[in-house]
Amino acid sequence: MSNQATSEIKFVIVIATYYRKDGLTLKYLTRCLESVKKQTYTNWVVYLIGDEYENTDEFNKFATLIDTNKIIIHNKPDPERKHILDKSRLWNIAGASAMNYGLNLARSNGEKYYVHLDDDDFWESKHLENLYQAYQNYSNCIFAYTKSTYPYAHVVPNKILPREDIKSIFPNNLLPRNSNLIHSSVSFRCDIIPFDYHTTHNVSEIKGPSDAIMWDTIRQFILSNPAYCCIFIPEVTCRHDEEGSIKN
């Protein structure tokens, strides 16, 4: 098992979060962080980015759930929700500026291996182990992801994304594309992939979900740069059992 903290592959786990007035963030984020602590692969650090988290005492307490040398927290002001008042449109870009803050902090700190985790999602214990194996076995891999649960059977009948029944692992066995993967299942080389998540304060500039735009952009980047590849790992290691709470 490749769980040595001395491995050169160190994952930066960026989690953007906000204060839900129904109190559910405490439940969600505690579960989320507990799943990180249970990872069999242990060379990681959490960047917990508050999207103007209003309850600052609660936000600061989240840092106590992880060893102090394994977490960096920052509460970022000026979230998208202050500018985009249509919740159905806000859902497309909510938290993108907080994610970009974490992503670019990782880049400025010289980190290479970005991993995303939504605060209301969580991982099975071997999620990072699987991503590590992808990077370890394929040195030209710059994007890796796994299977994930999905909550709506009327959209995805077996409630698993991606939809394809891929069983073998090889370079570009399943390139990313919008609406076919879950954000929290993803990792990429942030030192090679230069893009940020699309965000705006102008409702007329919302082009679609920020992560979906990112996947299509990265797909084209990989196709245009054949020295690099994507690795899809056909194992369910990500739990995305609900979504769209910001619309409610």
Curated annotation (Swiss-Prot):
Its EC number is 2.4.-.-. It comes from the Viruses. The keyword Transferase applies. Pfam families: Glycos_transf_2. Keywords: Glycosyltransferase, Transferase. The keyword Glycosyltransferase applies. One of its GO terms (molecular function) is glycosyltransferase activity. Belongs to the glycosyltransferase 2 family. This is Uncharacterized glycosyltransferase R139. The lineage of its organism: Viruses, Varidnaviria, Bamfordvirae, Nucleocytoviricota, Megaviricetes.
